[in-house]
A protein has these predicted regions:
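A short glycine-rich, Lys/Arg-flanked "PGG" loop and its adjoining helix->strand segment in the class I
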Residues: 135-147
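Core SAM-dependent methyltransferase catalytic element
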Residues: 188, 194-212
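A short acidic, Gly/Pro-enriched loop at the edge of an enzyme's catalytic core
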Residues: 111-121
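Short alpha-helix
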Residues: 172-187
Length: 212
């Protein structure tokens, strides 16, 4: 059985936690239609490295955790998420992988501090929802990476439609190109591209960078 670690005391739920308490039930059934590039990112990571210790920040329902376990059968995987409801889904989804998977209920506002570090830190459609906080998350990821380790990101990038940007803001997403400059400055880019979704309604970013 996989492990869930939770702090002994918790503050009141945030707006984001309340948002995902309901969305956890429908997340996997709906997000395929607009969270593009997730499977492709895992495939590309596998062409660059063979990580044995991996961390996903904002692991949600565990879709990527299960994918990492299948692609890297010798690896140990840790997932961190602020939503108990999403972690409950992730626990069911990753049970077949047993003790290889550890789930942690916490914010990622400071490094986990594992002495061995991680070969890969993955952020999949998470950083754009950390507002404020994505800068802090990137600093924590850099500290948690082992020497030579990589940060892998797929996320919303930008849109030229103000109405769509405002709507995404209602759903806690910031998408005004804020992530790419920080990623390029903080990590050595190995993959760094922006692609259009739905004919250019918005763009999404795929980035893999090595720890400097």
């Amino acid at each position: 059985m996989n492990k869930i670690n939770s702090p002994t005391a918790r503050p009141a739920p945030t707006a984001l936690e309340n948002y995902y308490r309901w969305h956890a039930r429908i997340y996997d059934a709906t997000r395929w239609s607009f969270l593009f590039g997730r499977t492709a990112l895992l495939r590309e990571v596998a062409t660059l490295a063979t990580p044995t210790r991996m961390l996903e920040v904002g692991c949600g329902t565990g879709k990527n955790l299960a994918g990492l376990c299948r692609r890297f059968p010798q690896a140990a995987v840790t997932g961190v998420d602020l939503s108990e409801a999403m972690l409950a889904v992730a626990r069911r989804k990753t049970t077949p992988f047993g003790p290889r998977v550890t789930l942690r209920h916490r914010a990622y506002d400071q490094p986990l501090g594992d002495p061995a570090g991680f070969d890969l830190v993955l952020c999949s459609y998470a950083l754009s929802m950390f507002n404020p906080g994505f800068e802090t998350t990137l600093r924590a990821a850099a500290e948690d990476l082992a020497p030579g380790g990589c940060l892998a990101v797929v996320d919303f990038h930008a849109t030229r439609f103000r109405a769509f940007e405002r709507w995404m803001g209602v759903n806690h997403v910031r998408m005004n190109g804020q992530l790419r400059p920080l990623l390029q400055a903080g990590f050595e880019p190995l993959i760094n591209r922006v692609e259009a979704a739905y004919g250019g309604v918005w763009q999404y970013l795929t980035f893999v960078g090595r720890k400097k």
